[in-house]
Amino acid sequence: MPNPSSTSSPYPLPEEIRNLLADVETFVADILKGENLSKKAKEKRESLIKKIKDVKSIYLQEFRDKGDAEDGEEYDDPFAGPPDTISLASERYDKDDEATSDGAQFPPIAAQDLPFVLKAGYLEKRRKDHSFLGFEWQKRWCALSKTVFYYYGSDKDKQQKGEFAIDGYSVRMNNALRKDGKKDCCFEISAPDKRIYQFTAASPKDAEEWVQQLKFVLQDMESDIIPEDYDERGELYDDVDHPLPISNLPTSSQPIDDEIYEELPEEEEDSAPVKVVEQRKMGQDSVHHTSGDKSTDYANFYQGLWDCTGAFSDELSFKRGDVIYILSKEYNRYGWWVGEMKGAIGLVPKAYIMEMYDI
């Protein structure tokens, strides 16, 4: 029998065989990875790996050509090496295409250390190289941190497998990526002249949530105008990076009785802000603690996300990391709460603070 390693086939590999090998590879390198196998099962696994290696050696040129034509990337052989190195070979296969499409590089960071995570969870990520013998979809723990999309092998990883800045991209649902029961769970992130990233979520609802969160951040990046995101009551949420200044706060959703305020035509532009400030100050006179016992009221302890300097005397100024105790959320609809810090009481932009305790 000729040595497979020295034999090359003049015929292309049939699609049915490619599909079969892909299924076997998935089972051997992915499903059985890390399983506590019996001695007999381990021997069978090694036998299957050897057979796949033999087939690869016969169709080596075709395999390489397909990989180069599709992605222009070098493919890492998942089964290189003797059988006793199978775990290392499988890990090499799991290594994703980590280079970013635009050449930008981000420092390694552990999944648990990502700051300001807006959305996170497990997704199936489509491989850039998903040709013959390659897993088309791989499970990845993904996170949107500020304006960078990271993906990891798991949420315990100390370093990302890849990442990309979403600036300039667009996102949409795409049910044409798969033909199975998950076709309505797919979405893609794309941009002209850049790599397309395609994902499958656990459910259509989860996919929609990813799309909406990405769209919200992208809209915020494209304009200095705060995107309007309404909750069920139709109230406005303030954008994190651009809180509403006092002078631009809406006065009220209800019409204001003209008899309360005297009309001053020459000061018409300033009349609305004065009313809002008066309303805030009147409400602040009756500020009360949100809980009876401050020492155990952990839910109302917050800390500064960024440095904030108050524009008015009734606003608190604080630094990133400062501890603020929230006394009242009376102005929640305007994006402001009433807080106390080091004995001083004042208005705090809620977009500039985060919960101190995870309750």
Swiss-Prot record:
GO terms for cellular component: cytoplasm; plasma membrane. Keywords: B-cell activation, Cytoplasm, Phosphoprotein, SH3 domain. The modification Phosphotyrosine is found at Y75, Y151, Y197, Y261. Disulfide bonds: none annotated. Residues 67-88 are annotated as: Disordered. It is found in: Cytoplasm. Residues 297-358 form the SH3 domain. The modification Phosphoserine is found at S5, S6, S9, S87, S90, S223, S286. Gene3D superfamilies: 6.10.250.220, Pleckstrin-homology domain (PH domain)/Phosphotyrosine-binding domain (PTB) (2.30.29.30), SH3 Domains (2.30.30.40). Residues 116-219 form the PH domain. Pfam families: PH, SH3_1. GO terms for biological process: B cell activation. Interacts with FYB1, which is required for SKAP2 protein stability. Interacts with PTPNS1. Part of a complex consisting of SKAP2, FYB1 and PTPNS1. Part of a complex consisting of SKAP2, FYB1 and LILRB3. Interacts with LAT, GRB2, PTK2B, and PRAM1. May interact with actin. May interact with FYN, HCK and LYN. Interacts with FASLG. The SH3 domain interacts with FYB1 and PTK2B. Belongs to the SKAP family. May be involved in B-cell and macrophage adhesion processes. In B-cells, may act by coupling the B-cell receptor (BCR) to integrin activation. May play a role in src signaling pathway. This is Src kinase-associated phosphoprotein 2. It comes from Pongo abelii (Sumatran orangutan). The lineage of its organism: Eukaryota, Metazoa, Chordata, Craniata, Vertebrata.
